[in-house]
Amino acid sequence: MEIKKYNYIARYWKKIQSGEIEVCSKIYKTMEQLINIQSGNDDKYHFDPVLANRPIVFIENFCKQSKGNVGAALKLELFQKVILQAIYGIVDRKTHLRKYTEVFICIGRKNGKSTLLSALGNYGLLGDKEGGPEIDCVSTKRDAAKIVFNAARDMVKQSPYLRKYIKSRKSDLYCEYNLGVYQPLSSDSNTLDGLNPSMVILDECHAIKDRNLYDVMKQAMAAESRKQPLFITITTSGYNREGIYDELYDYASDVLEGRAEDEHFLSFIFELDSLEEWDDESKWIKANPGIGTIKSLPKLKENVERAKKTPDFKPTVLTKDFNLKNISASSWLSWEELNNEELFEADEVFDVCWTEYLTIGAKIRYRKIFDQINSIEAK
């Protein structure tokens, strides 16, 4: 099959520059980096349009929808094609191996993430030219890990081409053509030892409190036999603070801002830039790039209006639809509102040694010693 040399990264960037598509600051920085490579400004890596389009052609021709319009061709959105081209199309000029081996994607719910990952897993199993590929779809619980896996298996059932090469077994998908396997795994599996994944798919990492599962899978990808392993984490925001989600989010932010160097780490963080934007319909696309096509705009409008009238529902919308951090599912202040990192001098605030304030129902006592705040005591 002929591979067209479409450049979806450049097309997306053009729409961003013209204002046709609005993106958040983190996506803008990611796109700047990708365009810089495409422009030939990187001595080590370049954009290969044939390699970039291979997974897109595979998915749109051989992966069929397993929900809704069952059996119909799966057509990818522009932002999904951009993600795939960035992962598979930016390669080393000499070895032609992929630049990125770890990808972190944060996106609002109902933007097709499970469908994209399940199709990508099938590509990794059959279309990526990997010998003995091992696709491990992991989560904290096996039932959660099977969400993406079951979607992949249903795609195989709907596709005559995939059925020809991929067999559905009790606990996995098996490809006799290249001795490949696609399997769901979890931290409560009997063992995670002896794995040799060519691709790891970690879904909904916001729910992971213990980072052990992430660490085990990262270590499993260290085998010399895998020249370009791929670790993909995809998630919405969540309520667990200081977990692996926060760590990956902060690390991605550091890489984007230049505070950390990691040429093999790529992120696509779709989010609102500020809390105020949740009430502005024109900004919703920042966290929901599939709005109006994959995700229902009327339904999102309905949820936002309900959240305005129901305080307990508001954190769910802010966190899951717009990827704004919240402390808990029932919190009424967002992480953005609570997390004030502004610095100040004690002299500017306190004129006496002891000062008491009544703040949100709690008495806070501050003590000034040597021009610094020495202690904060909450009563």
Where are these regions (language model features)?
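Phosphate/NTP-binding elements of NTP-utilizing enzymes
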Residues: E2-L358, Y366
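Metal-dependent catalytic core segments for phosphate chemistry
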Residues: K363-K379
